[in-house]
Structure formats: structure tokens, C-alpha cells
Amino acid sequence: MPDPLALAISTGEPAGIGPDITIGALLQLAGQNGHARYHVLGDAHLLASRAAALGVAHAWERRIAEGEVVIHHVPLAVACEPGRLDARNGPYVLSMLDAAIAGCRTHAGAPARFAAMVTAPVQKSTINDAGVPFTGHTEYLAEAAGVPRVVMMLAGPQPAHANAMLRVALATTHLPLRAVADAVTVPLLLETLSIIDADLRRWFGIARPRILVTGLNPHAGESGHMGREEINVIEPALAQARDAGIDARGPYPADTLFQPRHLRDADCVLAMYHDQGLAPLKYGTFGHGVNITLGLPFIRTSVDHGTALDLAGSGQAEHGSMIEAIRSAVTMAGHANGRHASARVPH
């Protein structure tokens, strides 16, 4: 039997629901992933206190004693109360991320300690208030890994096909809408499609990914009458991608692309901007979606929601998205280690 896959889980903003959903997810997953061991990064006292507040202290202690959950103590700067932010704990959040990143990297030929990392939500404002410029997990991980570009992809079960996944990647992420058209260029789309194609093969075991690409304008530009980005940028980028062996199709009108009959044979949809792609995905999958960063040299998954400060310590936080993030990380690591068969028959 192979050694258990070691997953790093950073517990996120200590005043938010990160500790709650980590504890809840790992208790619900008890015994379900016998080939995984969960390395939880965070303040051990905070986690024990939060488990007690949730009424699951004994179950949490048992998971640790059984060895399926391993606590890596990262000390808080100051004591934390659920729901109350403290900028002094901003560096604590980054310390957890740094430990997870270090564990996912190979060193001097030695294998990585962790097969993947899963991140609970962080409060960007707290980190910035601590004097550390921080725009988000994705950008921080890309800089730490030394890669020029990463791609945000969210995934969740297709509402009309319970056994099929809807994956939506973004050409641009956190940009004002007025800046999107200028940001969408042929080189950007080519690089984005290359990353998607490579990581769907590497992490998901898909032999020949099929990528459907949205237009930028209403009705995909209506043959140039509602904008020419489709003609001047997107179509040339898709042609070059196909010449490079990438199965990229489109551009399709975004308002009709997200239908079961179009998505049935798609491995991923590439949307041009944030709300164009994530609004339909979250409508159908919110609370069970997974945020996946493509283009990194290691696997990173996360939840599809924020810190929910008002729910911290209350026992009311849903941990479904954290469960799916953990399961996705296990599956992706399994593909990377050759422990799973290909997810689909080649086209």
C-alpha cells in the first residue's frame, strides 16, 4: 500500500471561519480518504479552543491522536477572538502560507514534504493593515513560486449532470470592467490556454482537454457589430492555440454557453473576466465549489467563499466547500502520483 498523501491545510484568518471549516471538514472526512494525511497549519491552542466552541473537542482530539490529522503549530501574535480582526495577526496568516509553500517545494533533489496545499480564506485587509502589501492568495503564491503567470479556475458539480464537473477559468481576474478589453490580448490568451491545457493533463489526468472560450462582447461581438475583440484578438489566439495542439473552441456568446448541452463535453470554460465566468458557476455550485490555482509548480486548492467573520465560532458555518477543496487536492495529487486512472477517454 502506498504511503499516505500528505496535504498541507492553512487555516486562514484566525478571527474568521477558517479554523471552523477546517475542523468540521476533517471530522466529516474521517476515514474517507485512507490514503491521505492532513497536516494542519495553525495555532494549536486556537484550534483546540475553536473545536471546544463548536462542541467537537473530543472528536478533534481523537483525530489527532489517531494520526490522520497532524497539527503544525504556528503561534498567533496575539490572542484571537472569533469575529474580531487584529492586524497584529496579519503576519501569522502569511507564516502559515510560507510553511505550506516551503513544504510543497522540492529542495536539493529531495521530494516535497506535502503533495498539495489547501487554503482557508484570509482577510486581505488585516494583512495590508499589518503593513504587508497583499492582493490575495493567488498573487502571493505566484510570487513565492517565481512563476510569471497563474490562472484562477473554479470548479463545482454541474447542476444538470451530477457526475460531471463544471470548470471555469478566467483570462483576467480582479480588474475594473473598463480595463478588461485592453487587458485581453493574444499573448495573454495563448499563455492562459497553455496553462489550462497543461494542468488539466498534469493534475486531472485528462488526455486531451477540450476548452470552450467565451467572447468578450454581447453575442460574441455579433460579427463585429458589437465590438471587434473577438475578430481581432480572441479568434487569432484560438487559431494559434490550435496550431500548438490545444483543443480550444470559440468564441461563444457567454449568455448561452453555460447550458448543459454545451457543457456536456467540455473540460473547462475560459471566460474573459471575473463576473462573466463566476456568476453562472457560483449560481449552480456555491458552497460546494473549489478555487484552484493553475500554473504553479504545486497543487493549491481553496474554498469558494470568504472569512464570514459573523459566523466564526458559532457552529453555523458550512464546510462543504472545504470538503470539496480537500477532496480535489487528494484527487489531483493522486493523478500527479499516478494513483488514478485517466479521468476521461481521449477525444
UniProtKB/Swiss-Prot annotation:
GO biological process: pyridoxal phosphate biosynthetic process; pyridoxine biosynthetic process
Further remark: The active site is located at the dimer interface.
Binding residues annotated for a divalent metal cation, in chain numbering: 174, 219, 274
Cofactors demanded by this protein: Zn(2+); Mg(2+); Co(2+)
Enzymatic reactions: 4-(phosphooxy)-L-threonine + NAD(+) = 3-amino-2-oxopropyl phosphate + CO2 + NADH
Chain sites annotated for binding substrate: 137-138, 282, 291, 300
GO MF annotations in UniProt: 4-hydroxythreonine-4-phosphate dehydrogenase activity; cobalt ion binding; magnesium ion binding; NAD binding; zinc ion binding
Function as written in the Swiss-Prot or TrEMBL entry: Catalyzes the NAD(P)-dependent oxidation of 4-(phosphooxy)-L-threonine (HTP) into 2-amino-3-oxo-4-(phosphooxy)butyric acid which spontaneously decarboxylates to form 3-amino-2-oxopropyl phosphate (AHAP).
Subcellular location: Cytoplasm
Protein family membership: Belongs to the PdxA family.
Membrane-spanning residues: none
EC number(s) given by UniProt: 1.1.1.262
Cofactor binding note: Binds 1 divalent metal cation per subunit. Can use ions such as Zn(2+), Mg(2+) or Co(2+).
Pathway: Cofactor biosynthesis; pyridoxine 5'-phosphate biosynthesis; pyridoxine 5'-phosphate from D-erythrose 4-phosphate: step 4/5
Keywords from the UniProt entry: Cobalt, Cytoplasm, Magnesium, Metal-binding, NAD, NADP, Oxidoreductase, Pyridoxine biosynthesis, Zinc
Subunit structure: Homodimer.
Protein name in UniProt: 4-hydroxythreonine-4-phosphate dehydrogenase
The species this protein was found in: Cupriavidus pinatubonensis (strain JMP 134 / LMG 1197) (Cupriavidus necator (strain JMP 134))
